Amino acid sequence: MYTIKTLNAISPVGLAKLPANQFEIDNEAAAPQGILVRSADMHDTPLPDSLLAIARAGAGTNNIPVEDCTNKGIVVFNTPGANANAVAELVVGALVAGSRNLVDAVNWAQTLKGRDTIAKDVEKGKKAFVGPELRGKTLGVIGLGAIGARVANAAVALGMEVLGYDPYISIDAAWSLSRSVQHCVTLGDMLPRCDYLTIHVPYLPTTRHTINAQTLAMCKDGVRVLNFARGELVDNAALLDALNSGKVAQYFCDFPTEELLGVKGVCCTPHLGASTPESETNCAVMAAAELSDFLKNGNISHSVNLPDVSQPRVGGRRICIIHKNAPGAISAITSILTEAHLNIENMVNKGKKDVAYTLLDVTGNVTDDLAVKLGAIEPAIRVRVL
């Protein structure tokens, strides 16, 4: 029986993927083996020795102390793509709403309540909210992952010319893209051509302030910028300067901050990207499945701090070892198994930066002290025997 602690409300459809005869959901557990989390900040949350894995029902893991988890042999999962449709739909809606000035128009229309001259005032006032159609305009998409590819394809369907920039595009994402999406080798190739610009990359130290004074200077005057990925991807100070100069006509984002609120030309939604029932369910189901497969079988899929390693069970016992990605690690592991007269039926080893994961199926008499012996080798971080 595994104990799972939830730090946020998790869709019951997702929790149903953790059968009650194998998993206990205890939100007050002091020593859980797994944690399910959405947006709760875990940086000040103690990580008990019992904890084997954290599954984030969402894509970003900024709220999780990933490095500390890695050092303790705790696997951190996320759910890439589970909320992609929800975010992509919101971006398309923001493209339309922003271009046609719908937010300001709706707010203005509300001020007409109680007047006897509403029809007349509407005809007179609507000219203040005239905005361009999307058809025939050019959209630049930075990042062509699950969300960016969907946005690009939707924009093509709306009749836009779509330019894409992603030096790390995956094969799956490339296959999913419309042939009409034009590939740009550099931002310099793309930015001067865009009427609209949207960014869809993960937040990393290397992507912080991707939209900055330098990149904005490359854009054509009057560009409309959208950010439904992470607030830190845009340098707000540079963005506000560009708004004041007319370089940027509008900034539509999902991350309100004190400096952005109330600024003319800025539309902020309250982090609605994944806020749909379908998205929450998809993320919860995926997170629960990842957590279950790891706890029961040692398989890792969609981890942010360890390599993806998965293999079917072939009988016997399974040994799961998180260790330093260092020379001699595999030799040390197999030497101990040989001394224990265990036969390796199947083995997978993969590394990810400084850490590696080895999954072994063995036959023979697995004694209680095997995990202790394996854990004593210098490269070992954490050992489980299933």
Tell me the role of every PLM-derived stretch.
Residues 1-79, 212-214, 218, 224, ...:
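An N-terminal-biased, well-structured beta-alpha scaffold segment characteristic
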Residues 43-45, 163, 167-260, 275:
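Rossmann-like adenosine-cofactor binding region
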Residues 80-138, 299-304:
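Phosphate-binding beta-alpha-beta segment of Rossmann-like dinucleotide-binding domains, i.e.
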Residues 88-107, 153-160, 285-299, 334-338:
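Oxidoreductase and adenylate-handling cofactor-binding alpha/beta cores
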Residues 144-145:
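Glycine-rich Rossmann-fold phosphate-binding loop(s) that bind the pyrophosphate
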Residues 148-149:
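N-terminal Rossmann-fold NAD(P) dinucleotide-binding loop
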Residues 213, 221-313, 357, 386:
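Rossmann-like dinucleotide-binding domain for NAD(H)/NADP(H)
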Residues 301, 305-386:
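A conserved regulatory-domain signal marking ACT and ACT-like small-molecule sensing domains
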